[in-house]
Amino acid sequence: MKILFVSYEVYPLAKVGGLADVAGSLPKYLEKEGVSVQIAMPFHKKVKADNIENTGIVITTKHLPEKYSFEIYKTPLPGSGVPVFLFKNDQLIDSDEVYEGTDLALQAIAFSDAVVKFAETLEPDLLHVNDWQPALIPAYISAFYNGKPKTLLTIHNLGYQGEFDKSYFYKTGLPEKLWQEGKAVKNGAFNFLKTGIVTATAISTVSPTYAKEIQTPEYGAGLDETLRALSDRLFGILNGIDYSEYNPATDKRIPVNFDINSLEKKKENKIALQKELGLPVIDVPVIGLISRLVEQKGFDLIEAAAEKILSNDLQFVVLGTGEERYERLFKSLGERFPEKVSANITFNVDLAQKIYAGSDMFLMPSRYEPCGLGQMFAMRYGTIPVVRFTGGLRDTVKEFNPETLEGNGFGFEEYNPDKLLEAVEKAIKIYENKTLWNQLMLNAMNTDCSWDKSAREYIKLYKHVLNSGRDILNA
């Protein structure tokens, strides 16, 4: 089985969000299971790799009215034999940042068409494309290649759809009937993600719960009707995390290594974190939060409940950047409660690891969360998630029961600041019982969040897709 995996970001070459972690991990685990995998991504200016070679191949777009050419570079995905093909066009890919540029829509259109042209040479059985930027790939294959090879479109976050002016549709060279039949349009705009959804052989998203949620008006972001109509080819598979990369026993980014048999050393990471961030070194629960500071993540709940949460004996460590409103919120809390709050309005991978290893709890009160990786990283390091039960958080975090000693975290259902406060205070109460807390840490660290299981699920889905004989464009 040959898979061409297409993503705009791949860790460690270029990372903005969780998609990079998925794209940098899943192909390695597929390779371990015997799948032949290759990756295609734009050659962003921020791409970092030790050995990048120019293949000498130049791919010119095939279907766009205006032609664009990409030089193809190649580098191995670190820790694997998976080749990454980098598509270089400095005219289109003209920003230092992954999701910035003079014309993101045209960049995504040209990249998608170039990948399809390149696939003629690679001859994969299936193209696995991720999010809206390469979502036109299924449309090109459906329109011009009789639906072969097959395509799987994975939606990592339905909130980002790639909506642009209708004029961009005519830059794609795609058949007019896609527009006339409403397959490429939402609210009068050209919608990249919808175009991919209706033309892909199959669609997946990053947790079973989110696959159900996006078929409802509450979570469907205006595409719930489309997704309900296609529910027979919509699947949910949980993301995993790379256990070789995120391993408290070997992680060089944390002060003291530990494992499930030396949990007492976790406390040394907590003390080191308190010292580094200028917090008093005292035995109170440290709650970590690492996130993009955006509305989706539930920070309006924290804003409403902050005073009551901080009236408890605890410390709160924040790391992330995002909307100015929330950056101001956490800076203000840091200034008002300097003994309790450390607000780090930046992104620093090393500090993130220290927070995962040194915190007692990890807060994710998300409004919606397609999968979430933070709770998985946290549990790997014995840090207990406190979450809102939505999307992948519902699939991975189970409420701790002090009677049966089962469960790996704490959560709440209703999107409400009082419910958030209740969940935090429940966690604090269990923290005060060291026997129960030790059991809870063991449960968290024993939770299987590795890619092994997920990779096998994807292989099952690939086989299902390859056996599907649907002509999507004419369906």
UniProtKB/Swiss-Prot annotation:
<dbReference type="InterPro" id="IPR001296">
    <property type="entry name" value="Glyco_trans_1"/>
</dbReference>
<protein>
    <recommendedName>
        <fullName>Glycogen synthase</fullName>
        <ecNumber>2.4.1.21</ecNumber>
    </recommendedName>
</protein>
<dbReference type="GO" id="GO:0004373">
    <property type="term" value="F:alpha-1,4-glucan glucosyltransferase (UDP-glucose donor) activity"/>
</dbReference>
<comment type="pathway">
    <text>Glycan biosynthesis; glycogen biosynthesis.</text>
</comment>
<dbReference type="Pfam" id="PF08323">
    <property type="entry name" value="Glyco_transf_5"/>
</dbReference>
<keyword id="KW-0320">Glycogen biosynthesis</keyword>
<dbReference type="Pfam" id="PF00534">
    <property type="entry name" value="Glycos_transf_1"/>
</dbReference>
<dbReference type="GO" id="GO:0009011">
    <property type="term" value="F:alpha-1,4-glucan glucosyltransferase (ADP-glucose donor) activity"/>
</dbReference>
<comment type="function">
    <text>Synthesizes alpha-1,4-glucan chains using ADP-glucose.</text>
</comment>
<keyword id="KW-0808">Transferase</keyword>
<feature type="binding site">
    <location>
        <position position="15"/>
    </location>
    <ligand>
        <name>ADP-alpha-D-glucose</name>
    </ligand>
</feature>
<dbReference type="GO" id="GO:0005978">
    <property type="term" value="P:glycogen biosynthetic process"/>
</dbReference>
<keyword id="KW-0328">Glycosyltransferase</keyword>
<comment type="similarity">
    <text>Belongs to the glycosyltransferase 1 family. Bacterial/plant glycogen synthase subfamily.</text>
</comment>
<dbReference type="InterPro" id="IPR013534">
    <property type="entry name" value="Starch_synth_cat_dom"/>
</dbReference>
<dbReference type="InterPro" id="IPR011835">
    <property type="entry name" value="GS/SS"/>
</dbReference>
